[in-house]
Amino acid sequence: MRIPSHHATDAVEHVFHAWDAALGAKDLDASMALYQPDATLESPLVRHLLGIEEGIVRGRDNLRELVAQVFAKEPPQRRRFRAGFLSDGNRVTWEYPREADGGEQMDIVEVMEIRDGLIQHHRVYWGWYSVKLYEELQRSARLG
């Protein structure tokens, strides 16, 4: 097992904190500046928001379109409470648990792989509560 250097871990954590701040501020330019030009993002939302078959966005320009829609359509259950994160010097992983201070929130786990100080791959995994909320939104959109 390779133990990451403090420098590598610090760089990954810096990207994570900068991304978290940009997400909280809904700052599209700041968040996009943290991704490699050929970055990928995998999420259940990709198919829904971009209307494509695959759940993967490739490239910063396509990612910008997705993140702009996420910022515009974020449901109230998408709070951002988390207890911390894990990093191995190349990737960072964190969880938004369903049970959070103040009630339930969307249960999500995210993983980012960092290359040369920028996000290369970003994967988003949903728990059952997030899927349930998504299905309810889909149902109400069809009925509305």
Task: Identify the function of each model-found stretch.
Residues D20, V57-R60, G102:
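N-terminal/domain-start segments enriched in small and hydrophobic, helix-friendly residues
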Residues T9, A30-D88:
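A solvent-exposed, acidic/Ser-Thr-rich amphipathic alpha-helical stretch
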Residues M1-H7, R64, A68-G144:
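A beta-strand edge to alpha-helix "cap/lid" segment located at domain peripheries
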Residues V12-F16, P44-H48, T93, A100:
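Generic alpha-helix detector with strongest preference for long hydrophobic helices that associate
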Residues K26, R60, H122-R123:
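Basic side chains
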Residues M1-P37, R139-G144:
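Short, low-complexity N-terminal intrinsically disordered segments enriched in polar/charged residues
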